[in-house]
Design a protein with these regions (language model features):
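Non-heme di-metal
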Residues: 2-369
Length: 369
């Protein structure tokens, strides 16, 4: 059974982080790691978020909130006869390792949203925004719990209560939360639906039953993105002036992170029967198409220089990982050098011209892909 998780259930006195680290699982330790490529936990200026005024998007807002309130996916995140038994030890070693990494990363991302949205609801005073975050926290809680149930089946569940306390939190201004979370939700939809559609055509490559749940799952991600689109559109300043440069930054950062991270899981994608480059470009194009609802620009995904930038970033990341594994003074020097090279490459990618987009009169889209 899928148990929802709530970060506010963690208020009772418990042992310190140091006392508990000795007993945590490898998957929990993995979820605790914070790097440029791993999902992070965020906090923000909640008083600033209380100033959100949804009146400019009132009609679409009310429809979306009514949809979320109806909870169309209630009952979906429960196992049924479609959940096949699987012997994870029967998977090839590299596939098993990368699949577990995928699950832990996905759980961390979902739980990050759960924690952030729950905190927004708890600390906010804007009732309309608090209502929204309550629904989104509910959904992310289900997602994280469902993934953790799959991990627990193999005896490698993540201690999410411990994770909420021990994970480092990154402060983002509200507008950065809007841009980053909007993209996270929409690219999450694009990733999940692309995998789901592929496995519909090739069910023999579905090596775990959790993929059968991806369609309704990604519809939650889609509706969360719709909410952040409306928040962005509620204040024209978030789509104009210097904020255009921030939008470009987050588009590039999110896409580059996905590209590099996916190439760190070759066995996982081979197991699904997908080519990583083809898959990533499908996801990028779908995410770009969707993001036209609220972003005044999109990356030029047809520019060969951008593709080469992604490939170069992936090669540099391998150098960074090798230097980190080497350790010692020489390893630290090499890691610093290649990290600087990654920053230079990002700047080179950033100056590649984008394509302008005229924001449509209305925002709402439907998950029809």
């Amino acid at each position: 059974m899928n148990n929802h998780v709530s970060p506010v259930d963690l208020s009772d006195h418990e042992p310190t982080v140091e006392e508990r680290m000795a007993g945590v699982s490898d998957t929990t330790r993995s979820a605790l790691v914070s790097t440029m490529l791993t999902p992070r936990f965020y906090t923000t200026d909640f008083e600033e978020m209380d100033k959100i005024n949804v009146e400019p998007v009132r009609a679409e807002w009310d429809v979306l909130i009514a949809q979320m309130k109806s909870d169309p996916n209630r009952g979906h995140f429960k196992r049924n006869e479609q959940w096949d038994d699987i012997d994870i030890e029967g998977l090839p070693d590299d596939l098993r390792e990368e699949f577990i990494d995928f699950l832990v990363s996905s759980l961390t991302s979902e739980f990050s949203g759960c924690v952030l949205y729950k905190e927004m609801k708890r600390r906010g005073k804007n009732q309309e925004i608090c209502e929204l975050f309550g629904y989104m926290s509910r959904d992310e809680s289900r997602h994280a719990g469902f993934i953790n149930d799959a991990l627990k089946e193999f005896g490698i569940g993540v201690n999410m209560g411990f994770l909420a306390k021990a994970k480092k939190y990154t402060f983002f201004k509200p507008k950065f939360i809007y841009y980053a979370t909007y993209l996270s939700e929409k690219i999450g939809y694009a990733r999940y639906i692309t995998i789901f559609r592929h496995l519909e055509k090739h069910p023999e490559q579905r090596f775990h039953p959790i993929f059968k749940w991806f369609r309704e799952w990604c519809n939650d991600e889609f509706s969360h993105g719709e909410a952040f689109s409306l928040i962005i559109r509620s204040d024209k300043r978030l789509m104009e002036g210097m904020n255009r440069y921030w939008i470009k930054f987050f588009l590039l950062a999110v896409f580059a992170t996905m590209y590099v991270r996916d190439h760190m899981r070759p066995a996982f994608h081979k197991g699904l029967g997908v080519d990583i480059d083809d898959y990533d470009m499908k996801v990028f194009r779908l995410t770009s198409e969707i993001s036209r609802q609220c972003f005044p620009l999109v990356l030029d995904l047809d520019n060969p220089a951008l593709h080469e930038g992604f490939r170069r970033m992936e090669r540099i990341n391998r150098k960074v990982m090798a230097a980190d594994a080497k350790g010692g003074i020489s390893g630290r020097i090499a890691k610093g050098f290649w990290s600087a090279a990654a920053a230079v490459n990002f700047v080179r990618m950033y100056v590649i011209p984008t394509k302008s987009n005229a924001i449509p009169a209305t925002s709402r889209l439907q998950p029809v892909w």
